[in-house]
Regions:
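Short phosphate-coordinating micro-motif centered on Lys-Gly-acidic
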Residues: 1-5, 99-103, 108-156
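Hydrophobic anchor at the beta1->P-loop junction of P-loop NTPases
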Residues: 39-41
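Phosphate-binding P-loop
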Residues: 2, 25-36
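Conserved lysine of the Walker
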Residues: 49
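Short beta-strand-centered segment that lines the nucleotide-binding/catalytic pocket of NTP-utilizing
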Residues: 62-77
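The conserved Walker
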Residues: 45
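N-terminal pre-Walker A segment at the start of P-loop NTPase domains
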Residues: 1-25
Length: 156
């Protein structure tokens, strides 16, 4: 599947609704992935990546507040078993990585090779040589204080 969508959002609430729709798409896929589905989040600081993931996590009934794991780099959230065959949602923020190999020491290969995981990666360009070509690219463009352009390209 190779599809693209473009949205203009006027608020963080609209951004979260688009993200929730994407997570519902993954839930309906019934986990037919050979490896973890990966969401590549691209955009400048403050462009809406973390806000998007807050909306994304709602459909998976994740109760923890989603915040950017800039200093911890990787955060794992359990997905309730009755909801999905997915078990974990990983939020990875590569912004502060000193070098690309640092991510391997944190278990990236195991995380992305497990089809029971869903993985969202901020700043994926910093570790692109370790990532698969297929995935869901979400690009954020800051237009004004609350307005964003969000382009989603699904290539799974």
């Amino acid at each position: 599947m190779n599809k693209g969508y473009t949205f203009i959002t006027q608020s963080s609430l609209e951004t979260k609704k688009i993200a929730k729709s994407l997570s519902i798409f993954l839930l309906k896929s019934k986990n037919t992935f050979a490896k973890a589905p990966i969401i590549f989040l691209e955009g400048n600081l403050g462009s809406g990546k973390t806000t998007f993931l807050q909306g994304f996590s709602k459909a998976f009934k994740i109760k923890n507040k989603i915040s950017s794991p800039t200093f911890t780099i990787i955060k794992r959230f359990k997905i309730p078993k009755k909801l999905s065959t997915f078990e974990n949602f990983y939020h990875i923020d590569c912004y502060r990585l000193k070098n690309e190999k640092e991510i391997l020491k944190l278990g990236l290969e195991e995380i992305i090779n497990n089809p029971k995981n869903i993985v969202a990666i901020e700043w994926p360009e910093k570790i692109k040589k370790f990532l698969p070509k297929k995935g869901i690219k979400v690009h954020f463009q800051f237009l004004s204080l609350n307005k964003r352009k969000i382009k989603i390209k699904i290539n799974v």
